[in-house]
């Protein structure tokens, strides 16, 4: 018999319907479910695929460098980073007429181009790249790494080079190598680059390349202070406040500082502070990489650590006993932990990229700031929901009740009703108490009595900001109390520039907050708690619930258990994930709306618009969404087109994709099955058309698959729509 797709499942390969294709694609990466899979082969396949992932990442970043070097304007941008628009790549479109060619020819280019809103120009500039040749060199190097990764992936699939199962299960060695190798050594290497190339080359005008790399001294006395123990010398004579970035004017000689705050000209963190930070990180992680015991006999055994964690008084059962083997033998548990950590870090990156910008001049590129914040928050949302999805799969496929008797994991399952009901209460409370004031304020505005709004000052948040040095609110506490010991000690010991930065209104550090912020923070809290409720309930009920005690026998994603148990529809762990993604998107919508509107008013110098309009719903709809979409809808108008046309088209297209999602989410399997059978009947009776036959009988998607397709369209359309709105409304105002 001929081999048909999918080769990894003979059962599916023999399916006579089109289900074979869709289920084949859906389970292609679920290695655990494949025929003839063993635990060892499973680990080896995943390990080899990591090399493929790295190859794709290196190829993609290489492409960024290559296209900017080939079609961008990097060399002219660095002459005037604040006024020249950075070009991502050229556009070639045979449909372009003359008006379009003119509209998209900008940034000093000869033809139509796309503008870069990713911040790569600022990054490359800050770390010391100066010419197109530098960019080409970087692109080639990354291409080389990509090739190397592919070879590595192929090599580790060869019998001789396949790592054994015991190698994959050696958690202590892996942690040591990842901590000291991945984080420690790479942070040290980055410190080296900043000190040897970026600080002398990028910041102080001494262009460092391969040919003079060994000649340019990063510090006049070289390693002297390090070897004689006078480390404080490396912090003396920093760049002055009138330093012109990229020149020797006002430049110092310090390489590792604790200045705090921002470089007055570039509005970004001091490079010498960044180098110091990475050196500290490297030091910590190099030590941490020697923390776990391997065959050298030093350090801790993770298993011993966990077993020793017996809670005092015995009130929490057997503590962490059994956790080591549970985690070490479950890829889904490990992936869940990794995704949870990565998701949180990605969201932190979004927060810190705008509040503490690290790259020269990026803070004044408003569209890039908005795009990077939004991008990282959406990525964080998807990654965090994924963490709970794999947590649920762990409970279904990998959890062993005997191994985890009365430990923290078992006790989480034992009192899940209390956890879920408390989360439900918190979500309900936040929902009613946030929507209530918004609706009340809306009605008051509509009736012409704005003075009757419920406006609550966020005094606790303002108090926290004051403790960090913000003097606006007059709290006179800790770092905002100029007579207090904290303030005086802080001025002398650390970060003298920090307090200036906190109290300047030209950056995004500790933005002044009021009643509008108070309300939207609670709206976001509602979204976060509801998303968490759905995800936590999905994971904790994944093995079974009072309604369906045998749920784990049905697997991760099932539609229902037939008409006999009617209440079993929509309660699989997959359905919880599916519902949570809608809430996640909803929440990040509020987060990005808030961030964008507050910053637009800040950048335009009319913060009162946000303060006055953000306290009621019509304010958000009219003064944020409607007002800022006007440029967008003007991409095409009776006078022709302009450079926002592409975003206007994307805005419409995004809505179309989003709306298509509902076709899959609302009309289900029976409707489509009837339609398909009618179409197949018509096809077979139509001359010429009936010459074409298909081997598989066409059938509708399953309920779960249709939901996935609907969710994918909803998510992609939602993000496309907002991306177009965000970029067009920001670049339309600020260029």
Swiss-Prot record:
Q: Does the keyword Transport apply?
A: yes
List this protein's GO terms for biological process.
Answer: photosynthesis
Q: Per UniProt, where does chlorophyll a B3 bind?
A: 663, 671
Query: What are the binding positions for [4Fe-4S] cluster in this chain?
Result: 560, 569
Binding sites annotated in the UniProt record for chlorophyll a B1: 655
Cite the record's note on assembly. The PsaA/B heterodimer binds the P700 chlorophyll special pair and subsequent electron acceptors. PSI consists of a core antenna complex that captures photons, and an electron transfer chain that converts photonic excitation into a charge separation. The eukaryotic PSI reaction center is composed of at least 11 subunits.
Read off the PANTHER family from this record. OUTER MEMBRANE PROTEIN, OMPA-RELATED, PHOTOSYSTEM I P700 CHLOROPHYLL A APOPROTEIN A1-RELATED
What name does UniProt use for this protein?
A: Photosystem I P700 chlorophyll a apoprotein A2
Specify the taxonomic lineage. Answer: Eukaryota, Viridiplantae, Streptophyta, Embryophyta, Tracheophyta
Q: Which gene encodes it?
A: psaB
């Amino acid at each position: 018999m001929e081999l048909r797709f999918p080769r990894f499942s003979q059962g599916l390969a023999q399916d006579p319907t089109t289900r074979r294709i869709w289920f084949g694609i859906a389970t292609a990466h679920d290695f655990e479910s494949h025929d003839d899979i063993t635990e060892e082969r499973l680990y080896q396949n995943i390990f080899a695929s990591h090399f493929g992932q790295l190859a794709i990442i290196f190829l993609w970043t290489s492409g960024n460098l290559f296209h900017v070097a080939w079609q961008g304007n990097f060399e002219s941008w660095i002459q005037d980073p604040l006024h020249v628009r950075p070009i991502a790549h050229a556009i070639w479109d045979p449909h372009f007429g003359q008006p379009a060619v003119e509209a998209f020819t900008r940034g000093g280019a000869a033809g139509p181009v796309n503008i870069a809103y990713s911040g790569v120009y600022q990054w490359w500039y800050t770390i010391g790249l100066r010419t197109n040749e530098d960019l080409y060199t970087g692109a080639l190097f990354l291409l080389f790494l990509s090739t190397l990764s592919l070879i590595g992936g192929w090599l580790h699939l060869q019998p001789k080079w396949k790592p054994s199962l015991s190698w994959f299960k050696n958690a202590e060695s892996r942690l040591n190598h990842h901590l000291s190798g991945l984080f420690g050594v790479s942070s040290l290497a980055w410190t080296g680059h900043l000190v040897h190339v970026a600080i002398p080359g990028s910041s102080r005008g001494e262009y460092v390349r391969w040919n003079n790399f060994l000649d340019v001294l990063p510090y006049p006395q070289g390693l002297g202070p390090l070897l004689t123990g006078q480390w404080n010398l490396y912090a003396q004579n920093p760049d002055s406040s009138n330093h012109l970035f990229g020149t020797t004017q006002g430049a110092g000689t310090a390489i590792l500082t604790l200045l705090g705050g921002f470089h007055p000209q570039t509005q970004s963190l001091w490079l010498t502070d960044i180098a110091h930070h990475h050196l500290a990180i490297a030091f910590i992680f190099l030590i941490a990489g020697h923390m776990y015991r391997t065959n050298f006999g030093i350090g801790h055994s993770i298993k011993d650590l966990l077993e020793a964690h017996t809670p005092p008084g015995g009130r929490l059962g057997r503590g962490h006993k059994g956790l080591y083997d549970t985690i070490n033998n479950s890829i889904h548990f490990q992936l869940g932990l990794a995704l949870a950590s990565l998701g949180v870090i990605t969201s932190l990156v979004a927060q810190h990229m705008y509040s503490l910008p690290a790259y020269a001049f990026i803070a004044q590129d408003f569209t890039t700031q908005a795009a990077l914040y939004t991008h990282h928050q959406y990525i964080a949302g998807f990654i965090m929901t994924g963490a709970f999805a794999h947590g649920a799969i762990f409970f279904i496929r990998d959890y062993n009740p005997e191994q985890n008797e009365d430990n923290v994991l078992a006790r989480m399952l034992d009192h899940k009703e209390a956890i879920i009901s408390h989360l439900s209460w918190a979500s309900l409370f936040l929902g009613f108490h946030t929507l209530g004031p918004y609706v009340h304020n809306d009605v008051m505005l509509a009736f012409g009595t704005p003075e009757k709004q419920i406006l609550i000052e966020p005094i606790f948040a303002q108090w926290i900001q004051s403790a960090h040095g913000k003097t606006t609110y007059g709290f006179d506490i800790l770092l905002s109390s100029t007579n207090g010991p904290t303030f005086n000690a802080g001025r002398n010991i650390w970060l003298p520039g920090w307090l200036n930065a906190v109290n300047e209104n030209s950056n995004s550090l500790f933005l002044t907050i009021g009643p509008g912020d108070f309300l939207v923070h609670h709206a976001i809290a509602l979204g976060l708690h509801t998303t968490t409720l759905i995800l936590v309930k999905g994971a904790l009920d994944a093995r079974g619930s009072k309604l369906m005690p045998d749920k784990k026998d049905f697997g991760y994603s099932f539609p229902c258990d037939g008409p006999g148990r009617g209440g079993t529809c929509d309660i699989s762990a997959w359905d919880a994930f599916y519902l949570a993604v809608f809430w996640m998107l909803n929440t990040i919508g509020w987060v990005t709306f808030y961030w964008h509107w507050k910053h637009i008013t800040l950048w335009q110098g009319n913060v009162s618009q946000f303060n006055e309009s953000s306290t009621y719903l019509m304010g958000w709809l009219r003064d944020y969404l409607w007002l800022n979409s006007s440029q967008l809808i003007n991409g095409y108008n009776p006078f022709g087109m302009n450079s926002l046309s592409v975003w206007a088209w994307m805005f419409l297209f995004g809505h179309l994709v989003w709306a298509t999602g509902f076709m899959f989410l609302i009309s289900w399997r029976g409707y489509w099955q009837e339609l398909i059978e009618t179409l197949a009947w018509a096809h077979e009776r139509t001359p010429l058309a009936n010459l074409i036959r298909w081997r598989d009988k066409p059938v509708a998607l399953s309920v779960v698959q249709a939901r996935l397709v609907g969710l994918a369209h909803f998510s992609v359309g939602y993000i496309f729509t907002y991306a177009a709105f965000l970029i067009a409304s920001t670049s339309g105002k600020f260029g």
